[in-house]
Amino acid sequence: MQKRHTDRESYFGEQSQTSKNYYIPYIKEVIGHIPDKVLEVGCGEGGNLLPFAEAGCRVMGVDIDATRIEQARTFFAQRHQQGQFIATDIFQLKDKATNFPLILLHDVIEHIRDKERFLSGLQKHLSADGAIFVGFPAWQMPFGGHQQIAHSRIVSHFPFLHL
């Protein structure tokens, strides 16, 4: 596993910068503004959500990994930011999160087995005029198989291994 994947606070910062420098400007261009509420599915430590919170958005992150959710709460508290983070399977979220004008899926969709059920289920969390932002690694890219998070030092630095 590469260092950037074991140092979760650094990874949080990396995600935050990517979101601030690329996602928010792109979303502003496409939607015309920054939505007031944002839901991220598969949020991990919440790094993608931090710039939205700093911009005054109400943010909610959902992740199946309870450890990541605790880290998100800690990282947000350290930065004096508000965010709601829930450790649950997205299929179990039910009506806890509704009416979001923006749902983020960053490097998540490739991990969902039942994509049709997943995507159709997101509608109940989306506002009538809402948008879903989907980012994913291209399979044909050097690290499209996520081998960079492998525990083997050799495998984690070996591009195209998944092909």
Predicted regions, residues:
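A structural helix-start
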Residues: A66, I112-R113
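S-adenosyl-L-methionine-dependent methyltransferase catalytic module, highlighting the catalytic core
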Residues: R113-G121, A131-L163
